[in-house]
């Protein structure tokens, strides 16, 4: 058996059950483990309680229980500069960003990884549901987590080969109930703590209220694609393509009682377009353009790839053909896709392996750009 005691692994600990069990498993496997709590956002919850303080208390309790040293590190400036400013800029541009993808790329596997190296880390580890496997030549492949409902490779798709070389995902081969069971058997104080939801820096707060603190809302007209006035929208940034709720129009416009959906945005005229029916023509597209395209291992500068893709988290894979040129790609769908949303990630898979991905710029329907923004 190999001696892991000479291998230092720095674990990103959030105060949740997943990262607690990550640290526990590595400690049990004999690694030299250090726990790090990242404070990325200065926050209080609806009751005025600082959530970071409460989470750090949980980290301290777990670290003491399993017998590992722990530190807290403040990445608020890095988070604001590299993630939150991007998040706001995307909303200003009428897009719907995915801050979790950027947070992993810029904070958890850049700022945190760099900090861990100053502590003499050989690897960093997180509680993500993903797997890494190493070829004989040392190349690392990132595979989906075994728990299909929890697989987080979608959010890790912008990681580089260099980052993956230094990363361990101890939970990748486990299902979520097994993780809870391990925490309970070890008597960890976080065993029954509920999973966090929502964007990391917003937590459980009302999204609309949160966003309005940073971006002034500009109400405008809500219209059908054929020009019927449907009332007023609260501000384009509050709506995403394919959204059903929150339109306030129900079936009051006579005739068809089919539900209404957001089908497009015109940023220059501040118009929100709506249409009836889940598969409204305006929601369907046949291809997309992506930028910031990146692969988890070395690929040619220009190539074509037949693979599957996800256009949002927890969506089933769809067959696609990808034409890559530098950091841009055209992605052609085998079957038309619904509600392709600029700003979201498109992520490519070859079977179990996550190959990488990019950010969606435009969706196309038979060669014509969809009026999404």
Swiss-Prot record:
Pfam families: tRNA_Me_trans (PF03054), tRNA_Me_trans_C (PF20258), tRNA_Me_trans_M (PF20259)
Taxonomic superkingdom: Bacteria
Residues reported in the UniProt entry to bind ATP: 12-19, 38, 127
Disulphide-bridged cysteine pairs: 103-200
Localization, UniProt: Cytoplasm
Segments for region (Interaction with target base in tRNA): 98-100
EC number: 2.8.1.13
Active site: 103 (nucleophile), 200 (cysteine persulfide intermediate)
Enzyme class, spelled out: transferase
Catalytic reactions of this protein: S-sulfanyl-L-cysteinyl-[protein] + uridine(34) in tRNA + AH2 + ATP = 2-thiouridine(34) in tRNA + L-cysteinyl-[protein] + A + AMP + diphosphate + H(+)
GO molecular function: ATP binding; tRNA binding; tRNA-uridine 2-sulfurtransferase activity
GO CC list: cytoplasm
Family the entry assigns: Belongs to the MnmA/TRMU family.
Function: Catalyzes the 2-thiolation of uridine at the wobble position (U34) of tRNA, leading to the formation of s(2)U34.
Protein name: tRNA-specific 2-thiouridylase MnmA
Gene: mnmA
